[in-house]
Regions:
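Short, ordered, surface-exposed loop/turn motifs in non-cytosolic proteins
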Residues: 4-39
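Short Pro-Gly-centered beta-turn/loop motif in secreted/extracellular proteins
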Residues: 26-30, 55-66
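A short, solvent-exposed beta-strand micro-motif common in secreted/extracellular proteins
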Residues: 35, 62-81
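Short, acidic Ser/Thr/Gly-rich low-complexity loop/linker segments typical of extracellular
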Residues: 38-53
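Zn2+-dependent metallopeptidase catalytic core
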Residues: 57-59, 77-80, 107-152
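Structured interaction patches on ligand/partner-binding surfaces of diverse proteins
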Residues: 75-112
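Long, charged, glycine-rich C-terminal linkers/tails
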Residues: 147-165
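Active-site scaffold of zinc-dependent metalloenzymes
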Residues: 163-193
Length: 193
């Protein structure tokens, strides 16, 4: 299970940055919750490893379509990336599968078309956010044992740098709120992301 990692480039001379889509590389979606579902019923749950690999066993009843779902949520520590403009739904990618021994490779793409984002294909962003948070948490955990509280990160392509109703994407700027104990991250194309 992988996502498109797009490096950021900063120019000291122009004091501006951009994303280098021509340098995109696939990276593993690590320690993420992965599920086999039959319709809306969860048949099996597990986690990807550090290489984005997984193995799940399940018994299907045959009553619905089978799918493999990878959530933008890690298992330890628990970090999840939600869409604050869609009822706090956890971001995910999925694909259909069949019964029996199945290999299914899922990939979250960046959705950049060369001039703009295709919103239906912009699935890498929440996994890139998740991977950055997971990398930071792991860095702390390698120094000494740390018990992290569950962290909720709110990202949406509708999050803009305007104050107002966060459920509508008006988050002001990327920030942590101590009242909610959650992080909000800008996501609107061309709006300080």
């Amino acid at each position: 299970v992988t996502y498109d990692f797009v490096p950021a480039i900063y120019s000291p001379s122009t004091r501006s940055g951009t994303l280098a889509f021509n340098q995109t590389t696939p990276r593993p979606i690590r320690n993420a919750v992965i599920q086999v579902r039959e319709g809306t019923t969860i048949l099996a749950t597990g986690a990807t490893d550090e290489q984005g690999s997984y193995s799940l066993s399940f018994n299907a009843s045959g009553s619905g379509a089978l799918s493999l779902v990878v959530l933008a949520k890690t298992t330890s520590p628990v970090i999840q990336v939600e869409d604050n403009t869609d009822g706090d739904a956890v971001w995910a990618i999925s694909g259909s599968i069949t019964t029996g021994n199945t290999t299914k490779n899922l990939h979250a793409g960046h959705g950049w078309t060369g001039s703009s984002f295709n919103p239906n294909q912009r699935t890498a962003a929440p996994f890139a956010v998740l991977d950055s948070m997971y990398t930071a948490a792991k860095a702390f955990m390698t120094v000494r044992p740390v018990t992290f509280p569950e962290l909720k990160v709110n990202w949406s392509p509708d999050n803009v740098p305007q104050g107002g109703d966060k459920k509508q994407g008006f988050i002001g700027t990327s920030h942590y709120t101590s009242q909610e104990k959650e992080i909000y991250i800008l996501g609107k194309e061309g709006a300080d992301t």
